[in-house]
C-alpha cells in the first residue's frame, strides 16, 4: 500500500479540498488529507498525506509557515484580499517608504491578530465567511500569533495613482492570516490594505524545492516515503533490534537521553523512532524513565499503522493559515 507525503505546488483558483480530490484519484485511495488550508487565490506548498502518512499531518499543521506576498496599500476589501470588493480607498501616494518599514516592524514578533472576517473560523457553529455572505455581522476575537520574519523586498509605486504595492516575505506561526497582516499594515498607515498575491514557500521542513505541480504528479506520483518525511519533521531516535520488537507491539522501552529536560519527546511533540534498517517504527513520547509509543507504524503481527494501546491516533488534519 502506497503511503507517504506529497508536496504539491497548489495552483491558483483551486481549493485545498480540490487538490485532495485530485490526489485521491492519482493515488487510487480515499485516505488522503492535507496539513493546512491555502485560500483559492494562493499558490504554493500544500502538504498532502496518503494512507498511513495521514497520521503525520497532525504534527505538520502546527509547524511554522513561510510565504511571499504582495500587499496593496490604499484599498481595503471585504475579504482582505483581491477576491473581495473594494469597500474603502484612501490614497497611499504620500506614505513614505520609511513609514512602511516601520509599520512592518510593528507587526513583527509576538502579536495579537484578529483573523479575517471571511475565514473558516466558526462563530456560533457557523463559518465566519458564511455569516458575512448572508449579511450578518462578524466580530472575531484577537488571538496570539508569532511573526518570526516580516521582510520588505520591494516597494512599487509604478502602478501610479493612489496605490502602493509592497512585496514581502513572511515567516510565521501556524494559524496566522497573511490577509490580516495586509489589512493591519494598511490600517496602521491610515490608508487600508489588502493582499493581491500569496505564495507559500515552506511548511515546516518541506519547501517549494520538493513540490510538484498537479500536472507533474499526473505523469509521475512523487511521494516522500514515511521514514524520510518523519526524519525531516521531528527529532529522531535509532532503535536496537530488541527495542524495535518491543515498540512494534506497543510496549514501552527505556526513555531517550533527553528525558526530563526541555528536549524530551512529548505526546504533542514526539520523536520518530527508526528500526536498524532505517524504517519508521513509531512516534515516541518520554514519560519518566520510559518512552512509550504514541503511534505505531511497524510491520509485523498486526501492529502496522495502529495506535499504541490507550492512545488515540491523530486523524487527518486541516488548518487555516492563509
Where on the chain are the PLM-derived regions?
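RNA pseudouridine synthases
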Residues: 1-180, 184-210, 283, 290
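Accessory RNA 3′-end/elbow-binding domains used by RNA modification enzymes
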Residues: 1-11, 17-34, 38, 42-43, ...
Amino acid at each position: 500500500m502506497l503511503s507517504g507525503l506529497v508536496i504539491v505546488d497548489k495552483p491558483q483558483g483551486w481549493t485545498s479540498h480540490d487538490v485532495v480530490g485530485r490526489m485521491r484519484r492519482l493515488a487510487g485511495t480515499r485516505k488522503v488529507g492535507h496539513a493546512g488550508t491555502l485560500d483559492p487565490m494562493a499558490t504554493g506548498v500544500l502538504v498532502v498525506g496518503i494512507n498511513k502518512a495521514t497520521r503525520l499531518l497532525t504534527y505538520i499543521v502546527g509547524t511554522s509557515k513561510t510565504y511571499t506576498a504582495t500587499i496593496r496599500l490604499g484599498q481595503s476589501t471585504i475579504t482582505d484580499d483581491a477576491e473581495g470588493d473594494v469597500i474603502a480607498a484612501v490614497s497611499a501616494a504620500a506614505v513614505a517608504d520609511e513609514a512602511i518599514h516601520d509599520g512592518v516592524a510593528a507587526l513583527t514578533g509576538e502579536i495579537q491578530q484578529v483573523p479575517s472576517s471571511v475565514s473558516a473560523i466558526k462563530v456560533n457553529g457557523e463559518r465566519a465567511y458564511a455569516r458575512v455572505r448572508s449579511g450578518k455581522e462578524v466580530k472575531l476575537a484577537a488571538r496570539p500569533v508569532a511573526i518570526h520574519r516580516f521582510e520588505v523586498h520591494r516597494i512599487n509605486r509604478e502602478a501610479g495613482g493612489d496605490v502602493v504595492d509592497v512585496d514581502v516575505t513572511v515567516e510565521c506561526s501556524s494559524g496566522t492570516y497573511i490577509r490580516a497582516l495586509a489589512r493591519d499594515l494598511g490600517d496602521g498607515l491610515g490608508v487600508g490594505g489588502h493582499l493581491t498575491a500569496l505564495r507559500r514557500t515552506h511548511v515546516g521542513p518541506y519547501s517549494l524545492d520538493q513540490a510538484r505541480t498537479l500536472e507533474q504528479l499526473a505523469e509521475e506520483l512523487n511521494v516522500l516515503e514515511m521514514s524520510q518525511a518523519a526524519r525531516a519533521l521531528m527529532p529522531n531516535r535509532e532503535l536496537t533490534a530488541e527495542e524495535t520488537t518491543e515498540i512494534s507491539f506497543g510496549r514501552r522501552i527505556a526513555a531517550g537521553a533527553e528525558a526530563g529536560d526541555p528536549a524530551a519527546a512529548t505526546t504533542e511533540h514526539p520523536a520518530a523512532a527508526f528500526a536498524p534498517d532505517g524504517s519508521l517504527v513509531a512516534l515516541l513520547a518520554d514519560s519518566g524513565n520510559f518512552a512509550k509509543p504514541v503511534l505505531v507504524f511497524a510491520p509485523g503481527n498486526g501492529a502496522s499503522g495502529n495506535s499504541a494501546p490507550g492512545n488515540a491516533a491523530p486523524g487527518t488534519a486541516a488548518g487555516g493559515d492563509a
